[in-house]
Amino acid sequence: MGKEKLILAYSGGLDTSVAIAWLKKDYDVIAVCMDVGEGKDLDFIHDKALTIGAIESYILDVKDEFAEHFVLPALQAHAMYEQKYPLVSALSRPIIAQKLVEMAHQTGATTIAHGCTGKGNDQVRFEVAIAALDPELKVIAPVREWKWHREEEITFAKANGVPIPADLDNPYSIDQNLWGRANECGVLENPWNQAPEEAFGITKSPEEAPDCAEYIDITFQNGKPIAINNQEMTLADLILSLNEIAGKHGIGRIDHVENRLVGIKSREIYECPAAMVLLAAHKEIEDLTLVREVSHFKPILENELSNLIYNALWFSPATKAIIAYVKETQKVVNGTTKVKLYKGSAKVVARHSSNSLYDENLATYTAADNFDQDAAVGFIKLWGLPTQVNAQVNKG
């Protein structure tokens, strides 16, 4: 009788490479790596998995699906965990889990493995998502089970013919996709240490950014960014392009001490140039086009959605319901913003929309004013009536 098939979420790094060598004793390991826009050498990763002992190796290009079905709903909901973090890693985990489950069904695998440690958020995100999509699949986490130190991993790797990554002495733990880059560990673990320039990878230091501002126009259709400077492109390509444009101006650097799902605080350095520009630009079009009641209510749901996504509940009914509400609000979110990029700042300086609720003739203080000021007297009386009655009854 043959071995059980196992799907391994494979990154090409030391942890998941050692996992192949360890798991192949009991399983037929199928390595699956998702391209979510991190810019890795995917051919090398594909071949490396086979060299170590995987029976099959797959590279899945999911950039467009990731952008359209995961990043876009988060953008439209202005999803920012603790008002600072655009959920870079948290957004990629659900699609990775989804593809792992699909590959398990396709290959007949009964088990999924991931390379997460026992103290991070991602173990929860993967396992909760997999359980939501197929509760019959088994999940194992070799790195969590081993509790090995890095030196023990290296010893095992050398003894089992696992190639040692060239950048093994890099003190940082980095995760990247098209929505941004996350960095932790090393000197960053002390929150009193200023992040050194070497900790950043996709943004220039604001001090070293160009001395001249750059202006770009971003066009939205139904809440979706579709063009930069009138050049239409897919959402994934637009985000990747904007990462380069805004990154060279030092935009999107975030230094965040965050509350992890597992109960500890961690210090993270994020680089999210495209995300920060698009979030600002999208909000300005909403300010023009959404009625007051929606503008005031939507942020309540946005905060809740941010927490749900961060806390591993992308596939929950609550997430689905909030995304449906947000999508309904986006039907009128059409227009263009002009954004000034300069030394770490992305500032919207102009905006227009065919659905704009801004009426200059109502807002102006010039002779063109057509606001009926006489109506204000009755409005004020009725609006303040409950307060007036309370003051009369309760003597203020």
UniProtKB/Swiss-Prot annotation:
Enzyme class name: ligase
Pathway: Amino-acid biosynthesis; L-arginine biosynthesis; L-arginine from L-ornithine and carbamoyl phosphate: step 2/3
Stored HAMAP family: Arg_succ_synth_type1
Record's protein name: Argininosuccinate synthase
Pfam families associated with the record: Arginosuc_syn_C, Arginosuc_synth
Gene (name only): argG
Quaternary assembly: Homotetramer.
Entry keyword set: Amino-acid biosynthesis, Arginine biosynthesis, ATP-binding, Cytoplasm, Ligase, Nucleotide-binding
Binding residue positions for L-aspartate: 117, 121-122
Binding residues annotated for ATP, in chain numbering: 9-17, 115
One annotated GO biological process: urea cycle
GO-annotated cellular components: cytoplasm
PROSITE patterns per the UniProt record, alphabetical: ARGININOSUCCIN_SYN_1, ARGININOSUCCIN_SYN_2
Location within or outside the cell: Cytoplasm
Signal peptide positions (record): none
Binding sites annotated in the UniProt record for L-citrulline: 85, 121, 125, 173, 258, 270
InterPro entries linked to this entry: Arginosuc_syn_C, Arginosuc_syn_N, Arginosuc_synth, Arginosuc_synth_CS, Arginosuc_synth_type_1_subfam, AS_cat/multimer_dom_body, Rossmann-like_a/b/a_fold
Organism: Streptococcus agalactiae serotype III (strain NEM316)
Coiled coil: none
Known catalytic reactions: L-citrulline + L-aspartate + ATP = 2-(N(omega)-L-arginino)succinate + AMP + diphosphate + H(+)
Molecular function in Gene Ontology: argininosuccinate synthase activity; ATP binding
